[in-house]
Amino acid sequence: MEHQQLRKYVELYNKEVEEFYNGAASGRPAEFHPSKVHVKSIHEKAGTANAGVEISSVGVDWDSEEKNTFFWCLSRYSIHRVDEWRSLLPRKSAMEILGYYRLLRRASASARSRKAGDDGAPIAYEMSAEWVALETKLSETVMAITEGAAEVADEEGHCEGLIDYESWKRRWVAIYSHSRIAEIRPLPRHALPLSRSATQTLERCVSRYTRTLLWCTALAGMASRSVSARAAESRGHKSLPTVVTRRQVERALCTEARSRDLHVLPRRIVLTLRKWELDYPREGKLFRTKEMAHLFLQSQLSRRDAPPVHQDENQENQENQENQEQDNTASEGESEAERDEIDEADLFRSALHENQLLKWLSK
């Protein structure tokens, strides 16, 4: 019996949360009847007019779903931000929404001016002590289950793993909780818990990313390494020590980011700012190191065409000469050293000024 009560309590809570975030789209029953709204307080319910009276065609039709959406947006945003949520009512203009709001305000003021009796008022129910005790018990049970799951997640996070979830929690407080997306605000100050399936999915993504990175760094060095015939026949020592430097990792990231859609950390930072609509000072320092900023620019340049740059005649002649020299030596092919060595000056040669490059990237 207690388990069934707890299950229904959780279902009721989840339903309230779904209605709060999704509003009229959550599938709850319609609470309003369709009607025709007119600026002169013509507010007739559909089907309630007398058979002999012709219904006026003047007015705006509001169905139940539109009314549910209207009142939900009014409670979440306010009427002063109607331009932000008007897209949720595609069949209504801003003036029609404001007209409906003013009509409701006049009806509310008129109702306050009259002495209202008890007729038609909803019945007030008083909760018994037994019901209050039951609700308190159910809420404490749900809280205990939630805290137990959080403790298990903390214990798993303290052990050594692929992902540092403590860093994720710190980022949530500093970054994600300040999102300006109206549909998900207000966000809690504490990081949302991750399920076990979500954790496993994230770890698989990290493993695939690391495998791709090792393929471009360690495997390339191992393939070009030569060993003696005696060492090749020996089966006692199976490991082959390989040193991977930071420069090799940076070159691999740049190469893979240009050849295919490999997400690098600086690019993920920018995508996060756009996805969560976060404000950040443009004159501030977005990346910690200069290498991360260069890596971001390289990844962006690989996904776009070259920015238009105004050049004079001397620069054009110089570039034509360089292109001719490159055409003469192109038949020899690119050597392995040229592919490994990424010259940053060549990547930014088309941008004469830093302001032009940044202005082009911000489009």
Curated annotation (Swiss-Prot):
This protein's record includes keyword Lipid biosynthesis: no
Primary site of residence: nucleus
Biased composition (Acidic residues): 333-344
Region annotation (Disordered) ranges: 301-344
GO annotation (BP), single: positive regulation of transcription by RNA polymerase I
Compartments in which it is found: Nucleus, Nucleolus
Amino acid composition bias (Basic and acidic residues), ranges on this chain: 302-313
Biased composition range(s): Low complexity: 317-328
Cellular component aspect of the GO annotation: nucleolus; nucleus; RNA polymerase I upstream activating factor complex
InterPro entries registered for this protein in UniProt: Rrn5 (IPR039601)
Keyword Transcription regulation: yes
GO molecular function: rDNA binding; RNA polymerase I general transcription initiation factor activity
Keyword annotations: Nucleus, Transcription, Transcription regulation
Function of the protein: Component of the UAF (upstream activation factor) complex which interacts with the upstream element of the RNA polymerase I promoter and forms a stable preinitiation complex. Together with SPT15/TBP UAF seems to stimulate basal transcription to a fully activated level.
Subunit structure: Component of the UAF (upstream activation factor) complex which consists of UAF30, RRN5, RRN9, RRN10, and histones H3 and H4.
Protein name: RNA polymerase I-specific transcription initiation factor RRN5
Organism: Saccharomyces cerevisiae (strain ATCC 204508 / S288c)
Lineage: Eukaryota, Fungi, Dikarya, Ascomycota, Saccharomycotina
Gene name of this polypeptide: RRN5
